[in-house]
Amino acid sequence: MNEDSRLSSSQQPSTSTPRSSIPSTMNSDEPNTCRRLSQSQEQPSTSRTCKSETPEFGYSDSLPFAPWRRKRYGLNIQGLHEEIVDMYHWIKPNEIESRLRTKVFEKVRDSVLRRWKQKTIKISMFGSLRTNLFLPTSDIDVLVECDDWVGTPGDWLAETARGLEADNIAESVMVYGGAFVPIVKMVDRDTRLSIDISFNTVQGVRAASYIAKVKEEFPLIEPLVLLLKQFLHYRNLNQTFTGGLSSYGLVLLLVNFFQLYALNMRSRTIYDRGVNLGHLLLRFLELYSLEFNFEEMGISPGQCCYIPKSASGARYGHKQAQPGNLALEDPLLTANDVGRSTYNFSSIANAFGQAFQILLVAVTLRERKGKNHVAMRAYKGSLLHLIMPFTSKELTYRNWLMSGVLSMPGQEAPASYDLNQLHNTLVSPMVDLSRYAWLRKAPAKAEKRDSRPLTIVNPADDRQTLAQQLKKQILEQTEAKKSLEKMPACDDNKKEEELVATRETDVELEAEDTESEGHHNGENDLILTGPPLPTSTQSVNTSATVSTAASISEREDTDSPGLSSSMGNQSSEEDEDNGINNRNNSAVPVQFKKPFNEVVAQPARESKRTQTTSEDKMQDQFHFNGYSYPPPSRYAAGTAAPSHKHRNAHPQRQRPSIRNLSQGSDGSDEYNVESWNNNIRQGRRASSNSPSPSRQQTNTRNCGPTNNIPYDSFRSQNKNSTLDGSNNSSEEPITMYADVVKKKSSITTSTNTSTADVNVTNGNPIPANGIIPQSMAVVNVGRGSYRNALTTSPMTPPSAHTSMQKQHHLRKDNECGFDNNSATSSTDLSHHQPQLVPPVNRLQR
């Protein structure tokens, strides 16, 4: 049924009938056909009759039957409430739909203003768009107000319709001049939305303001209005020109319901405790389908009461309402009957009754006796789907409308970007593409053939140019220097000034280069510094001894390089091991260590202070009969009363069979004969592994072996030293290896003690009176150490040297590979030079 047929039949009360219910061809039996036609006209449009419609081409039922469903709702009143809440959140207008309709309204407003530019008119929107209670398929209501209209209302409508067609913004335009409220109905070309344009109907704007106040007083009206509007729209009972109920009339019915039957729900929201929208919906359907007598009674929402139709007609001076019509008084204007066009309210009441029965049976199905397996199997998880399903056409249209709308201008019309909008998701804000219209416009110089693309600058090129500039400056400086050299001698002062200036510029350029390099490294996040290099275990004591005990005068006498305290620099031994790395890292290799024989052979002032390994110790010893013994040391008195702080702070590690010669640690008690390590040379007691308490006490034993040197001569050599190793004089005691080497050069063959006075048992000289002083006495004779064994056991002949080497419990003092046979015949240290032994003999030992 088209719009013309609907307008022609608007004078007679009739129900809106689906197209499929009317047969297209008449059978031979005309009475039966007329009877079926009359029955179909009397019956209201229900969900069953609407489902029988054949779907249009291009649409199918593949979309979900209840798109708002989030779960399987229970068959009870609480499940109905939860489903209504979910449907409200799904169907309510979002920001995209609101702004889209606002854009369409602005387009229509501009067109009407251009058409009536000679008159002062006012254009505004009202209805569901202003109250934000519109459905995805709702139309847009536009009001045109003007005080100096000339002619009949039909002329205004026709002129407005011609202007809309001329602007090419309407797909179709229809004029309804014979209606109670004359309107121009058009369909937008871009969005397919319907627009109703009315003239001088101020009541619509007032009604929109009234609905906004009602929503503030009864917030629960909003979800029920949207649900019932979709319910009526599904049955084609929402258009007034076909006898349906308008949106304003539906709001007044809900206001009357809340005022009389649910007044306690004022200012309550859907999430408040005690609110159940399912109960309110069932009560509303029951009231207006079974209890309200619309044929004899009218409704007055302003007075909160029911009024008989006869009284209403006589009271306001109007004729009585029609028996089948709805009498609904406007609270803003009591003389206005909002339901005067709702002549098909009987069909609306029947639809309310059917929905009430369906929902009532569904929510009470589990409470009934017996098992309704058929009903349970038919239930798909949604109750509202039984009374108001959404068609695939409506869902497809809504998704298309929110996905994106682009206006394509005609051939003659200029390019306009007023309606260009982009929507990505349902919650994304509106994006007006008019702000990006300049991207589509070609630049003025784009058509020229000699246009060149933009140059891409590489940062590397900038660095190259900077390097070239620096080279030019350097060349200029060199030329300036050459010119200064050619100047006469009389201008020496000027020449010096210019040289100073050039030097200053060189320094500035170097500073700039370093800053640029640092800036470049900072940009690339490159860290050029690293952690300190590890120090090998063989140079720990050596570096520590040299760095802590050496004085400034000693460092000046030696030719060793400067040492670093905490920067992690490599020691002399590591430099020798990593000679290849040193050659690669530095342009000019620096030799940090010399061979041992060169150090001993060279003068004392040129000796290396850092050479303090086991080789130094072997040099300080003298050899007798194949065994190495400590020389008559001048440090015995200094080590007579050592301190145990070093031992307590750094306990000795247990190493049963391996001795680290560079660190001076003893492996066992049998190795105590060689306790002259670097700690002794610093005036401290050497560490030991013996658990004996006598070894932990002070002033009970000597740190070194017993030396039978006359006490007087010993006092004469160390007259400035005290027993604790301190020096009372201003001159510091000599504790470094370099000084020991110096002393070696001054030793002569004429000594205080001769070889005849040497004790054959321990190799120490015997005093003249035959009395050994207490400081030189042997301690712990009963201990099984190698030193005590030498003092107590008889002298071993040279022939037994080979057998003594097989005793593994004795100390191997020849681990460095020196030939001791050359030292057995003489004890003169001044002419003693160590000789290296081949590796084969070294392995055998």
Curated annotation (Swiss-Prot):
Keywords: ATP-binding, Cytoplasm, Developmental protein, Magnesium, Manganese, Meiosis, Metal-binding, mRNA processing, Nucleotide-binding, Transferase. Germline-specific. Mg(2+) binds at D139, D141. Its cofactor is Mg(2+); Mn(2+). Residues 643-653 have a biased composition (Basic residues). Residues 1-55, 482-733, 788-845 are annotated as: Disordered. Residues 7-25, 535-551 have a biased composition (Low complexity). Its EC number is 2.7.7.19. GO terms for biological process: cytosolic mRNA polyadenylation; meiotic cell cycle; mRNA processing; polyadenylation-dependent ncRNA catabolic process; positive regulation of meiotic cell cycle; RNA 3'-end processing. It is found in: Cytoplasm; Cytoplasmic granule; Cytoplasm, Perinuclear region. Residues 276-335 form the PAP-associated domain. CDD domains: NT_PAP_TUTase. It holds the Pfam family PAP_assoc. Residues 482-506, 605-620 have a biased composition (Basic and acidic residues). It catalyses: RNA(n) + ATP = RNA(n)-3'-adenine ribonucleotide + diphosphate. Residues 26-49, 561-571, 579-588, 654-666, 695-732, 788-805, 819-828 have a biased composition (Polar residues). InterPro entries: MTPAP-like_central (IPR054708), NT_sf (IPR043519), PAP_assoc (IPR002058), Trf4-like (IPR045862). GO terms for molecular function: ATP binding; metal ion binding; poly(A) RNA polymerase activity. One of its GO terms (cellular component) is perinuclear region of cytoplasm. Disruption phenotype: High embryonic lethality. Hermaphrodite animals are partially fertile and those that produce sperm and oocytes have reduced brood sizes and display smaller germlines. Hermaphrodite gld-4 and gld-2 double mutants are fully sterile and display either an earlier meiotic arrest than gld-2 single mutant or a failure to commit to meiotic progression and a return to mitosis. Interacts with gls-1 isoform C. In contrast to other poly(A) RNA polymerases, lacks any RNA-binding domain. The gld-4 locus produces a single transcript that is SL-1 trans-spliced. Cytoplasmic poly(A) RNA polymerase that adds successive AMP monomers to the 3'-end of specific RNAs, forming a poly(A) tail. The enzymatic activity is enhanced by its interaction with gls-1. Required, together with gld-2, for early meiotic progression in male and female germ cells and for gld-1 protein accumulation in the hermaphrodite germline. In the germline, forms a complex with gls-1 which directly binds to gld-1 mRNA and prevents its degradation. This is Poly(A) RNA polymerase gld-4. It comes from Caenorhabditis elegans. The lineage of its organism: Eukaryota, Metazoa, Ecdysozoa, Nematoda, Chromadorea.
